[in-house]
Amino acid sequence: HAGLPDNGTLLAVAKGVRSQKRGAYLWSPVELSEAHALDAIGPGQHIVFTGTDGLQHSFEYQRHAEHEDGSWTWVGRLPGEPGQETIITFGDRAVFGSIAQGGDAPNLRLTTRDGRPWLVEADAGELATLAKWFTDPEESDARLPLPHAPRGAAGMRAKAGGQILPEAQTSTTIDVLVGFTSGFAQGLGGTSQAQTRINHLIEVGNQAHLNAETGVQLRIVHAMSVNYADATSNNKTLDALTGVDSDRKVYVDPDPAFADLRAARETYKADLVTVLRKFNAPENDSCGVAWLNGGGGTAIIPEDDEFYGYSVVSDGSDVDESDDKTYFCRDEA
């Protein structure tokens, strides 16, 4: 899927496979050169990207990350434009990426579907018509915890003195446990592809922390499958994962479907747990939701707040049957 030699550019449009128009998005089949990315590791190195319009962009190397499953991530930036990053994760069976275009232009996306890589381009004009509350919400995607959380749940164990990443010294490493639904993995083609996708999303998060100079690094300690439906409300799923009934504002037993995941939080000493599932519109109600400890001006009390170290994230695209339009959850959402 990324076996082109280094011919001086990251990708080439694949021959013999037609592009596909899906709503506001054009999917173009491409062939990738992982060799080009490997040759672009190191200060002063660049990845050259040639778009389907023939225009070239050059991205300067910022950092790279190697993952336990053998996948790895390259991060570069348009010269002189902080926040305009290209982030590409190469795995054994999949490649995922986000390619900055500068200014207000929407990022291009690299994704893997049906065993091959695709470049996804958004039509900015059509994209403006796709604003919908679950993918571009006006309300916050953070939830405030109920008061007086039960104690004794797996807790926050933020680490001091984490490893150093380029551009900022990390002072806190947050260990993350990821539970992914079977639908999420099947939609990508399998467990290997799901793991590559998870690694990519974590590195998108890490780059956001670097850009914001928070001194925080996210680290995956384990990823595992969970047997839970995708086409349900993210808010209800967060309640079921946490052990909360938000409608009645009471604590309840967590859904048994998450028993193994919650136990793994203790086993792997995870600070935070997220459930990653395939985006379903409009059933998910959003692209994700999490508890906001300390929200509303309340004090942060680790012994209490550890109970709320959970989040739910939707990933991918789906057609909303109510308007027959295709919606995406952004990598950085």
Describe the function of each predicted region.
Residues 1-124:
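N-terminal prosegments of processed precursors
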Residues 3-5, 121-302:
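Fold-level signature of zinc-dependent metallopeptidase catalytic domains
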Residues 45, 74, 95, 174, ...:
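Residue-level detector of short, conserved catalytic/binding motifs and their immediate flanks
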Residues 71, 92, 200, 328-329:
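An amphipathic alpha-helix/helix-turn recognition signal
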Residues 95-100, 271-278, 308-313:
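Short, hydrophobic/proline-enriched secondary-structure or compact coil segments at domain edges
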Residues 177, 304-311:
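Active-site-adjacent bridging/hinge elements
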Residues 310-333:
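Short pre-active-site segment immediately N-terminal to the catalytic Zn-binding motif
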